[in-house]
């Protein structure tokens, strides 16, 4: 029991650390700035693939903090995280833990695409600015590549226990 409490604390610290890493944007060219989306990867993996590792209140706090660090209107990320997580858990509930690498990647692609479309749409409506599609697509594909590596490591780590 004590080992699982420490593991849960370590995972929350990892999620907080990845949320802080989203401050360090990746600049490809002068006008293309990308977010690594590491916090989204950890939130997805430990709420949808491994159900209920992170409670909803923790995801809400991570979303608020992520918005504040990135200068986005506070609350949009939290709202979208919680709605999408509840929706994905509802449709994926019969298969509580996903240990299949392929299905894990497919679900992440679907989750990330819906999240980026909704977040970009809400921000475009709220700020009145139009966000460039190629920025979103590059961020999307880079995030999928990073998640494939991160997911394989996390799946291997969870199978060993």
Model-derived features with residue positions:
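Terminal, non-globular segments
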Residues: 1-161
């Amino acid at each position: 029991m004590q080992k699982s409490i420490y593991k849960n604390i370590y995972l929350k610290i990892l999620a907080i650390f990845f949320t802080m890493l989203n401050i360090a944007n990746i600049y490809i060219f002068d006008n293309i700035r990308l977010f690594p989306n590491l916090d989204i990867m950890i939130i997805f993996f430990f709420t949808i693939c491994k159900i209920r590792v992170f409670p909803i209140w923790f995801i809400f706090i991570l979303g608020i903090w992520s918005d504040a660090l990135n200068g986005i209107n506070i609350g949009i990320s939290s709202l979208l995280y919680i709605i999408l997580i509840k929706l994905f858990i509802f449709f994926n509930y019969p298969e509580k833990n996903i240990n299949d690498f392929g299905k894990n990647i497919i679900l992440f692609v679907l989750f990330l695409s819906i999240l980026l479309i909704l977040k970009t749409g809400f921000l475009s409506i709220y700020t009145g600015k139009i966000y460039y599609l190629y920025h979103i697509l590059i961020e999307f594909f880079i995030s999928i590549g990073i998640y494939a590596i991160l997911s394989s490591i996390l799946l291997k780590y969870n199978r060993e226990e």
